[in-house]
Regions:
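N-terminal regions of proteins, emphasizing targeting and processing segments when present
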Residues: 16-18, 55, 165
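N-terminal prosegments of processed precursors
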Residues: 20-154, 282
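Fold-level signature of zinc-dependent metallopeptidase catalytic domains
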Residues: 21-39, 43, 51, 157-293
Length: 293
């Protein structure tokens, strides 16, 4: 009986350690989801149901990443681990890949972006953004769904890992174009674009002026210019993911210009943009042009 019990215990330990690995950065979270106060992004309609939860030891993770930033760290790389959608930890070699032009990056040194190449999975590439508000990642895999990590708990200590697919019907609209048809059409067009974009060799960098509505700023907790870092952290998260796609498909990288902070707004009553219901109908196009020119 003792041998059977011992064998059962060992099997359980092996299964748990294999399914939910732990290192100095990440540990599997076994806390009941119902007991976690979640980040408001978790309530969005498109939020996935099939997720894995991990707790992040933020400061050591940040320290390793920040060891490869700045002029003194030029051409240096670091090795980090992140969890995947299967609940396993993977290693990546990472380098800094800033989305801010130099003057803006110098002013906000705690908001950073990184690119990584898979060690565990050689086909995987990583885009990672980090700020005092937490970490977000996007992983591209050959022949598999993209994967994401983003804060799950309100205090941004617990993170969710999930694949890019979603359940149909979760959003008020669905794409009805057949996957095979759209895949073939896009592949033909993208092949031409990629050849043209990459004919010059290296990834091209373009300067981006970005303006946001007051509602956008307010959503991320910023109600005045003194809290602009909250907005820039959110913009950096989005740019990191967008640049991951642009770099892969178009050999193009966007850098946010420092003057963008002059066209970030905080008061919905005085910003130059229409309410969402009107703006999304086309009004924002003209309003944005007037703001940036």
């Amino acid at each position: 009986m003792k041998k059977i019990l011992l064998l059962t215990t060992l099997l359980v330990l092996i299964l748990v350690s294999g399914y939910a690995q732990t290192d100095r950065f990440w540990s599997a979270n076994f806390q009941s989801r119902s007991s976690i106060t979640t980040d408001k992004a978790v309530s969005r309609q498109s939020y996935p149901t099939d997720i894995k939860l991990f707790r992040l030891n933020f400061l050591p993770f940040q320290q390793v990443l920040f060891s490869v930033v700045g002029k003194q760290a030029a051409n240096k790389s670091a090795i980090i681990s992140i969890p995947n959608a299967a609940g396993m930890l993977e290693e990546f070699t990472v380098v800094e890949a800033s989305n801010f032009e130099a003057a803006l990056q110098e002013k906000f040194p705690d908001i950073r972006s990184f690119s990584g190449k898979g060690i565990t999975d050689k086909s995987a590439t990583l885009k990672l953004s980090i700020s005092p508000q937490g970490v977000q990642t996007m992983v591209f895999r050959s022949g598999a769904d993209d994967e994401f990590i983003e804060p799950y708990s309100k205090d941004h200590t617990i993170y969710s890992v999930y694949k890019s697919h979603r359940e149909k019907g979760k959003l008020p609209w669905n794409c009805t174009t057949e996957d095979q048809k759209i895949s073939i059409a896009l592949s033909e067009k993208m092949g031409t674009l990629q050849l043209a974009a990459r004919s010059g060799g290296d990834v091209k960098t373009m300067r981006l002026a970005q303006s946001v509505t007051a509602e956008y700023s307010n959503y991320f907790g910023a109600t005045s210019a003194s809290q602009v870092s909250l907005v820039l952290a959110a913009i950096n998260n989005t740019l990191t993911r967008c640049n991951g796609v642009y770099e892969k498909d178009l050999a193009l990288h966007l850098n946010l210009v420092a003057a963008s902070t002059n066209v970030i707004y905080y008061n919905p009553a005085t910003d130059p943009y229409s309410a969402a219901a009107t703006g999304a109908g086309g009004a924002w196009n003209r309003e944005l042009q007037n703001t940036l020119t």
